[in-house]
Structures are given as C-alpha cells and as structure tokens.
Amino acid sequence: MKAVITVIGKDTVGIIAKVSDMLYRHNINILDISQTIMQELFTMIMLVDMQGAAMGDIADELKEIEKAMNLSIHIQNEDIFNSMHRI
C-alpha cells in the first residue's frame, strides 16, 4: 500500500531527518518527496511504500514527531488522498 505524508510547520533543523529516520526504522521506502520553504514555513509531501508496515503504528510515531517539533503531520492512503484532490 502507498501512503501520502504531509508535514507543515515552522522551518527548523531536523524535520526531514526525523521523519525519514522513523520511516527507515520501519523499512518504509520513500518513493517521492517534495519539500519547500516559504519564508519561515516548511512544507513537505512524501509518497511512501507502506508494504509490511501498520498504518496505525506509523501514524502514532508521526504524532510523536508532530508534538515534539510543533508541526502538523498527516498520513493517509494514497487512493484516499487522490480521491479527495481530484478535480
């Protein structure tokens, strides 16, 4: 299963490192990544391959990063993401 992870917050050192390290520890492959900084606002979208990983466990760990770094992080199934953003 593929999932989309979005991260938004004040730009600070280590955001990409924290998220990608957690994904690495769960053997989750990053298929695509887009990251932009607009003034002090950091935004990132990742497409990941969740094969063998439990969405709930990953969401829980992302919530920990979200709280620790004062970010907004969301994860959802790629199919749901695409359905919600179809014009």
Outline where the language-model segments fall.
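A conserved regulatory-domain signal marking ACT and ACT-like small-molecule sensing domains
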Residues: 1-87
